[in-house]
A protein has these predicted regions:
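Positively charged, small/polar-rich N-terminal and surface patches that mediate targeting and assembly
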Residues: 1-102
């Protein structure tokens, strides 16, 4: 079992929902997030995800527990989507292994 986390700007939320639907991910959770960076100067790898204290960056985080093959398929679809757009804020997706659960 894998824990998949996806960061998505709200402008691409509909596209993310379509990706979930296309590969039959029927159970996932989402939350709105405000990102902050102490010195948002535009020179770091993550500067497009975090705003300054005065202007936080608003995005969504979606997450789901998936079988490994489904998690890999989801990341492949996110990668395909990112390659199809010209944006400073592509979706970010992470797979985290689940060691134990009860």
């Amino acid at each position: 079992m894998k824990f998949v986390i996806i960061q998505c700007v709200k402008a691409y939320h509909h596209e993310l929902e379509q990706i979930f639907k296309s590969i039959r991910i029927n159970a996932y959770s989402e939350m709105d997030v405000e990102g902050f960076m102490e010195q948002a100067d535009g020179n770091t790898d993550f500067s497009n995800w975090f705003g300054s204290r005065k202007n936080p960056y608003n995005y969504m985080v979606s997450f789901s527990f998936l079988a490994e093959d489904k998690a890999n398929e989801l990341l492949e679809r996110v990668d395909e989507f990112n390659k199809s757009i010209e944006s400073m804020s592509p979706m970010k997706a992470y797979i985290v292994g689940v060691e134990k659960f009860v």
